Amino acid sequence: MNAKDVISRLPDEVLGRILSLISTKEAVSTSVLSKRWKNMFVLVSNLDIDDRQSVPKTKQNRIEIHRNYMAFVDKLLDTQRGSSIKKLTLKSHVGVRGGTDSSRIQSWICNVLDHGVMDLDVFITLKGKSPPVPAMIFKSKTLVKLRVGRGFTIKLSQDVSLPLLRTLCLDSVNFVGGHNVVGTLISRCPVLEELVVEERRCVDWTCSVSSPSLKRLHIRFDRKFTSISLDAPNLIYYKHSGYVLGKYPNVKLDSLIEARLNLRMDETRMVGVRNGSLGSIPADMRNLINGIRNVRILHLSSHTLELLYFSCKEMPLFDSLVSLSIGNDKARGWQMLPLLIKNSPNLETLIFMGLDHYITNRCGDVCVCYDTDESITSCLSSSQVKVLEILSYQGTTRELNQMKHFLEKLPCLELVKICVVNNSNNLQTTMEMRNLMMLPRASSKCKIQVKVLTKNN
């Protein structure tokens, strides 16, 4: 008995699971093997249909690929009638203008909803008029995970209800029916645990996210939005990127463990604020910062750190903060860093993605941009930081002076981890490492670890 016969004699349920481990296209192709395999692929409950496997070279190719793609989906879903579909991933990236029949997309979605689908991922790059998401998608009693993008229109009916939905991702969709469509949708998801909203289309948009079950939240705005309020008492992970909003009226994230803020504003306006030609930034971040004050792990991009300086004159006490990482950008300053370190009495780990930053006399005593009065007690001297990590270390004189400042001022340091970028000059790299090892240290327990990375890494 050969290996093929052994596999063919396995129970249908086992064969269905095996076929679920390969791509849907490959699973369908097994139907030509023998009569035994002719309709075996209908046992596959996880369908993954993606046109990226075919790379179009010309417009004609794109049109043909798109037609074949739609015909394949039609045929596949037609053969699945009566079968269980647990997961459908439907992706098309060809983006032929006028080539996608929105009614067919809607029929595909309705088809799998009728099959009791639990995990639905529809990501189709559309050109032209945005088709609406079928209303029944927001009334599903079986959906546990839902991702919709890109270019669809969402309009909610009064009877929206997703009782089992735990993960929701909305990527570049159009919202119709008021400013707080997202908030309304979330309120109809009683067990929602993870929410991702990436919005690049709407302008003058406001949102209020209130959910006692939400644990993870990622929001990204690439346009100028108005405001967002957040009330998620059990949220443990929060990521906020894109444009900073004008207002954060209410932010309550009392259980937060980790936060990542990567916010920016128009560069022209930022330059004006920095040089004094503009009075202030059109954003009030005070409620946002107060709302995350219980966080334990905080990641701030260099843009965010500078925005905080121009938006917040005061900083709350971060009693629970144990790890802080700062982004790297030579065009952004560290003006807010002294106050942030001072107001983090239990900070143990301080991470810099790089030491390059905008030279200013407002960085206080945390850096060596300008000579500081030695009689002034540094915020570093009272810090409890035990681990200092520096990434992308280039070994410049300015960086070496900054490292000297850190080592002389941080009294509780136990470990310094430095990632040196190798410039292909082994002798220079060796000298950089030697210079680092010879620096004086305020802490007798301080050890320095140096890791050398080549630029290819």
UniProtKB/Swiss-Prot annotation:
Transmembrane segments: none
Organism superkingdom: Eukaryota
Entries under PROSITE patterns matching the protein: FBOX (PS50181)
Disulfides per UniProt: none
Keyword S-adenosyl-L-methionine: no
Annotated ranges, domain F-box: 4-50
SUPFAM superfamilies per UniProt: F-box domain, RNI-like
Residue spans of the LRR repeats: 265-288, 292-315, 318-343
SMART domains in UniProt: FBD (SM00579)
CDD domains assigned to the protein according to its UniProt record, in alphabetical order: F-box_AtFBL13-like
Keywords from the named record: Leucine-rich repeat, Repeat
Any single Pfam family the record assigns to this protein: LRR_At5g56370
The protein, known as: F-box/LRR-repeat protein At2g42730
